[in-house]
């Protein structure tokens, strides 16, 4: 159900509270998922004119789970705070004295419900942390992370239900990784969606038993960051080592991700340097180039009255990854009607060369390769 459809069914006096939750409500570490509501119902009599829904189920993303709490207002007394039912978390009993926004409920503030939900989620986090005391190993993992503010202040924990047969329970740690994405080139962060939310990397680590014999890590990137780093398949994190600890493993993942970000930033600046060098060396031979991301360059060149194009595609992780050179005849066509071309990656190249050296080496390579390309174009293409 879309937020607009849901809000149209809410009692008008309660609508500002719910609107603030579904339109602006982001609680916890997962900034890519908003709060949402379902199961709208009314406690009013059938004679009450609509819209009159005053109770609903609130879905809250937390530590890779979705908490489903019932929130019950009274449309007849909209100035009163709501009641809460915590669904399957029957053992969760929040401390009323710590719910300041509930105790001093201000119906004139449209964000008062959202503020109460945030306080409840904080208490729910404390409740889940307390459950780890049943396992000395999981408690050790939690306490060592807590001692590091960069991890301890950005962590959510969910302890699963205890197995009645074995007495074991699983647990999941969700951490917001302290990785700086601010210097990623802006062109890479475009066109993902209209409201991308916060740029964030979340590491989920699931312990399937209390002795950490089965541990499954997974990295989640917000859409813009995933796109900027080359897609979901571009980053593979290491398996959790047998006998390892989170306090050792999490920095490894941070280091890996930081290096990946630096590769992308370095690639952008190196591509710009590369294209600037080609503009200098080839001058009017440059037909076009990508002036935003510096990922493409096209040259129109001549060798002994034979004109040809060279399309240069620079990869995201340039200069580590070698550019592709595609030679294209301006005279000859393939059977499908396309200009005859050949792609080349087997040419002199070193990622250690600067842009000027790459341009000089490319010019020398063009002179040696063009004769055989011309011969192939005449042999395989049609005028």
Curated annotation (Swiss-Prot):
Quaternary structure and interacting proteins, as annotated: Component of the ARISC complex, at least composed of UIMC1/RAP80, ABRAXAS1, BRCC3/BRCC36, BABAM2 and BABAM1/NBA1. Component of the BRCA1-A complex, at least composed of BRCA1, BARD1, UIMC1/RAP80, ABRAXAS1, BRCC3/BRCC36, BABAM2 and BABAM1/NBA1. In the BRCA1-A complex, interacts directly with ABRAXAS1, BRCC3/BRCC36 and BABAM1/NBA1. Binds polyubiquitin. Component of the BRISC complex, at least composed of ABRAXAS2, BRCC3/BRCC36, BABAM2 and BABAM1/NBA1. Identified in a complex with SHMT2 and the other subunits of the BRISC complex.
Stretches for region UEV-like 2: 275-364
Reported function: Component of the BRCA1-A complex, a complex that specifically recognizes 'Lys-63'-linked ubiquitinated histones H2A and H2AX at DNA lesions sites, leading to target the BRCA1-BARD1 heterodimer to sites of DNA damage at double-strand breaks (DSBs). The BRCA1-A complex also possesses deubiquitinase activity that specifically removes 'Lys-63'-linked ubiquitin on histones H2A and H2AX.
Keywords annotated in UniProt: Acetylation, Apoptosis, Cell cycle, Cell division, Chromatin regulator, Cytoplasm, DNA damage, DNA repair, Mitosis, Nucleus, Phosphoprotein, Repeat, Ubl conjugation pathway
InterPro entries: BRE (IPR010358)
GO-annotated molecular function: polyubiquitin modification-dependent protein binding
Name of the protein in question: BRISC and BRCA1-A complex member 2
Annotated spans, UEV-like 1: 30-147
Organism, scientific name: Bos taurus
Residues that bear N-acetylmethionine: 1
Free-text comment on this protein's domains from its UniProt entry: Contains 2 ubiquitin-conjugating enzyme family-like (UEV-like) regions. These regions lack the critical Cys residues required for ubiquitination but retain the ability to bind ubiquitin.
